[in-house]
Amino acid sequence: MALLNILHYPDERLHTVAKPVEVFDAALQQQIDDMFETMYEAKGIGLAATQVDYHRRLVVMDISEERDERRVFINPEIVEKDGETVYEEGCLSVPGIYDKVTRAERVKVKAQDRDGKPFELEADGLLAICIQHELDHLNGVVFVERLSQMKQQRIKTKLKKREKQNM
């Protein structure tokens, strides 16, 4: 397994709309394993392929405290949404930035597992939020882009300042 490089906002590659996965081969299995390793190392709970510059519709997720409930969503699609909730989100592509985002409270998602087998899942709570957040990535949207223009500008300024300090 290998650690992958996580793209950081405002990298334009994060705005790429991912293409469907069509081939379920050993290379895909390796990509999935590498994404889990990268997500765990970065202490994340979800990672979309777009975030590691792999522009296919693939998400890995594990919201458990024990880190033992791996979930893989390939070609995911939200088919139902219900309710509304506000949750403070963070993102591995926007390190150190957290803000409240409005999302559906419950979702139903259709996807394929790592072997290509179709499944449906109804989710609420943190799982529903995480699914929506990661699917945004597959559609080229970063969570901060769901905030007001003023907040987006403040975040960009903060990130630029941080980048200068790290040089």
From Swiss-Prot:
GO biological process, one term: co-translational protein modification
Active-site residue numbers: E134
Required co-factors: Fe(2+)
Chain residues that bind Fe cation: C91, H133, H137
Cofactor note: Binds 1 Fe(2+) ion.
Keywords from the UniProt entry: Hydrolase, Iron, Metal-binding, Protein biosynthesis
Broad enzyme group: hydrolase
Pfam families linked: Pep_deformylase (PF01327)
One GO MF term: metal ion binding
Reactions catalysed according to its record: N-terminal N-formyl-L-methionyl-[peptide] + H2O = N-terminal L-methionyl-[peptide] + formate
E.C. designation(s): 3.5.1.88
InterPro entries: Peptide_deformylase (IPR023635), Peptide_deformylase_sf (IPR036821)
Family: Belongs to the polypeptide deformylase family.
HAMAP family linked to this entry: Pep_deformylase
Function: Removes the formyl group from the N-terminal Met of newly synthesized proteins. Requires at least a dipeptide for an efficient rate of reaction. N-terminal L-methionine is a prerequisite for activity but the enzyme has broad specificity at other positions.
Protein name: Peptide deformylase
Organism: Chromobacterium violaceum (strain ATCC 12472 / DSM 30191 / JCM 1249 / CCUG 213 / NBRC 12614 / NCIMB 9131 / NCTC 9757 / MK)
Lineage: Bacteria, Pseudomonadati, Pseudomonadota, Betaproteobacteria, Neisseriales
Gene: def
